[in-house]
Curated annotation (Swiss-Prot):
The gene is HOG1. It is found in: Cytoplasm; Nucleus. Pfam families: Pkinase. This is Mitogen-activated protein kinase HOG1. The modification Phosphotyrosine is found at Y173. GO terms for cellular component: cytoplasm; nucleus. One of its GO terms (biological process) is stress-activated MAPK cascade. Coiled coil: none annotated. Keywords: Activator, ATP-binding, Cytoplasm, Kinase, Nucleotide-binding, Nucleus, Phosphoprotein, Serine/threonine-protein kinase, Transcription, Transcription regulation, Transferase. The TXY motif contains the threonine and tyrosine residues whose phosphorylation activates the MAP kinases. Its EC number is 2.7.11.24. It catalyses: L-seryl-[protein] + ATP = O-phospho-L-seryl-[protein] + ADP + H(+); L-threonyl-[protein] + ATP = O-phospho-L-threonyl-[protein] + ADP + H(+). InterPro entries: Kinase-like_dom_sf (IPR011009), MAP_kinase (IPR050117), MAP_kinase_CS (IPR003527), MAPK_p38-like (IPR008352), MAPK_Sty1/Hog1 (IPR038783), Prot_kinase_dom (IPR000719), Protein_kinase_ATP_BS (IPR017441), Ser/Thr_kinase_AS (IPR008271).
Length: 357
């Protein structure tokens, strides 16, 4: 049985196994407090995220289960990976992942990025999205603070599938709105992986310009700012809006012409402008895909089709429509955690046997 140690962080009890030491607060992540720690087993620095009261409501339990399933399934160099998970005696859940020194939001607020860094960061974002989308997963809340970077400029996407985007009045970071695709904002009938391409386009523009591209004060203002640059959406796109109120609002807006992006991004090279124009398209079906973006001329310094893997299998979303009581989610979660540790133990045993021969 693991031995647990308690510490108070920002008035919150962190109850972690003795494997981890030197707890330091890093900040609030999605639905939990994040600390850095030293993993005594691997001698590496890690991030430990405490999920607050995961079994307090069915909604929270399901959200935690979804995050656990996604972290277990997604294995890619540009996606954050799970290195440990445990339930404390107080029944809080802790996810342990690799620790990267900073995130893109902090980098962008500290200094302008040089061209080669912008290219390399965008390449890694697209490489990660190609894999994630091939697994049938949509991030839904891509923004600079969800993109982690270390001192070697290695980039990893984190906080997957957590945003409750079905709720257009979603609370949380106000800046989340800046990166949100129009089909989510206008509550169109359905959305898919293309929403992440729009968000990545907004992030790309912010790296080029040094400030958010569409800093809307609210959803109406947000949409207005988008149309100032990209013009009024075409009629066939407007007619896909399911909500009558939203449709009436969009049709009442003055017609606007698309502005050349070159006028706004005067220092960007032509290939950067071309890629950005292909990402920021109103019609999701006409937006460039992650795979296509990787092959674009702008990313050619890093593009290697032999080293841009896809997922071996699709993520199983069958649980997502389930409306289950907390106790059932808890049993399912315990089962996933046991499975994770059995698989990890199996790998370790195999390695020990192999090395012992």
């Amino acid at each position: 049985m693991a031995e647990f140690v308690r510490a108070q962080i920002f008035g919150t009890t962190f109850e972690i196994t003795s494997r981890y030491s030197d707890l330091q607060p890093v900040g609030m992540g999605a639905f939990g407090l994040v600390c850095s720690a030293r993993d005594q087993l691997t001698n590496q620095n890690v991030a430990v995220k405490k999920i607050m009261k995961p079994f307090s409501t069915p909604v929270l339990a399901k959200r935690t289960y979804r995050e656990l399933k996604l972290l277990k399934h997604l294995k890619h160099e540009n996606v954050i990976s799970l290195s440990d998970i445990f339930i404390s005696p107080l029944e809080d859940i802790y996810f342990v992942t690799e620790l990267l020194g900073t995130d893109l939001h902090r980098l962008l607020t500290s200094r302008p990025l040089e061209k080669q860094f912008i290219q390399y960061f965008l390449y890694q974002i697209m490489r990660g999205l190609k894999y994630v989308h091939s697994a049938g997963v949509v991030h839904r809340d891509l923004k600079p603070s969800n993109i982690l970077v270390n001192e070697n400029c290695d980039l990893k996407i984190c906080d997957f599938g957590l945003a409750r985007i079905q709720d257009p009045q979603m609370t949380g970071y106000v800046s989340t709105r800046y990166y949100r695709a129009p089909e989510i904002m206008l509550t169109w009938q359905k959305y898919d992986v293309e929403v992440d391409i729009w968000s990545a386009g907004c992030i790309f523009a912010e790296m080029l310009e040094g400030k958010p591209l569409f800093p809307g004060k609210d959803h109406v203002n947000q949409f207005s700012i988008i149309t100032e640059l990209l013009g009024t959406p075409p009629d066939d796109v407007i007619n896909t809006i399911a909500s009558e109120n939203t449709l009436r609002f969009v049709k009442s807006l003055p017609k606007r012409e698309r502005q050349p992006l070159r006028n706004k991004f005067k220092n960007a090279d032509d290939s950067a402008i071309d890629l950005l124009e292909r990402m920021l398209v109103f019609d999701p079906k006409k937006r460039i895909t992650a795979t296509e973006a990787l092959a674009h001329d702008y990313l050619s310094p890093y593009h290697d089709p032999t080293d841009e893997p896809v997922a071996e299998e699709k993520f199983d979303w069958s649980f997502n429509d389930a409306d289950l009581p907390v106790d059932t989610w808890k049993i399912m979660m315990y089962s996933e955690i046991l499975d994770y540790h059995n698989v990890e133990a199996g790998v370790t045993n195999m390695e020990e046997q192999f090395n012992g021969q």
